[in-house]
């Protein structure tokens, strides 16, 4: 019990000093170039990503599949799954991050300039994990579950590092929109 108290106190102090909110993140998108008559003639990508504006543009099966595989308690918790986090910590197997935590990690990565700083966003440390927990809780206070899912679907790489967003991956791998998955 005394060892637990010795660990809990510094963790609590560390927690207090962590930010609760993410800085605004701008994510690369597709730009369509128009000629003098307004006719599109090229698309330029700052990232290989097609953003959707509504969850209605994604099939219910894709949404259900994401929640079932990544975070079955997504609609019950306020930022992270206690059982998933505890399971990952006790088994020392990694993982355990729910949808909001994964989103926060990705948004931090996009927000950090330079490879060294981006490495900090994904390094496997207890400090990073604790920071993600607090940021995920803060993110869930500001955003609805639907907003979180939509942002997740628009920012995560599906299937390969070059297929960011479910729409891009759906078109690339299946030749159809995400609404038809």
Show the residue positions of the predicted features:
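N-terminal type II signal-anchor transmembrane helix
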Residues: 1-32, 40
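Peptidoglycan glycan-strand catalytic modules in the bacterial/periplasmic cell-wall system
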Residues: 27-181
